[in-house]
Amino acid sequence: MLSDREIFYALMLDSKNRLIGVNLVSQGGISSAIVVPMMVFKPAIIANSPAIICTHAHPSGDPAPSREDRDCTARLVQAGAILGIRVLDHIICGDGEFFSFADAGILTDSLP
């Protein structure tokens, strides 16, 4: 069951892409969550995590990324590149479905 609000997580991975931690970044409203790159990457820096996967759910049930989702992902990919932390994917969950920026081939399009 999906939450009635957007909740954004960053999954921290080790050098072999094994999960080493989960960071609750933001709990938003029914249509958005405020995602500050510093809050995404600070726990990853502390954990010496070289890569993260971001994920959040759309309470509407439609996993299609919004313009805000695309912009947020681009900012996170760019910030991660500066910090040396790869953003491997941003997965949006919906009602029994998901959207993966990496699977769609648009994650690397966010790089300058």
Q: Can you annotate each of these PLM segments?
A:
Residues M1-I20:
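Long amphipathic N-terminal alpha/beta scaffold segment
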Residues M12-K16, S26-P112:
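Active-site-proximal loop/helix of nucleotide/amide-processing enzymes and allied scaffolds
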